Amino acid sequence: MKDILFFYGLECPHCVIVEKHVDKLISEGINIKKVEVWNNKENDEMMMELDKGDDMCGGVPFFLNQNTGKTICGEATYKEIKNWAQGK
């Protein structure tokens, strides 16, 4: 099973809020890989490569489920992220 990717920026205020939800979900056993893009050119290039098509976010926070191809763009609640990660 592939990771769910969480793209974020260290200084992004929306990302700080969402990252708290991500950390809780990781502690509950949900497989999420955190990928910082504002200070890492390689990670930013990876996000740009993956953030394409009709569901394009164009920024952070950005979630990509590599198994389903589904995304979440922008600030989301803990419940929204958990339900999405579990395919609900």
PLM ranges: what are they?
Residues M48-L64:
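Structural micro-motif
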Residues K34-W38:
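Residue-level recognition of beta-strand->loop/alpha-helix junctions
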Residues V16-K20, E45, A76:
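Generic recognition of short, well-ordered alpha-helical segments
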Residues N40-L50:
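N-terminal beta-loop-helix "entrance" segment that forms/cooperates
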Residues M1-K33:
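Local sequence-structure signature of Cys/Sec-based thiol-disulfide redox active-site neighborhoods
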Residues P13-H14, K41-E42, K79:
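Short alpha-helical
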Residues C12-C15, C57, C73:
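Disulfide-bonded cysteines in secreted/extracellular proteins and peptides
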Residues G59, L64-K88:
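Non-catalytic, surface beta->alpha helical segment in thiol-disulfide oxidoreductase systems
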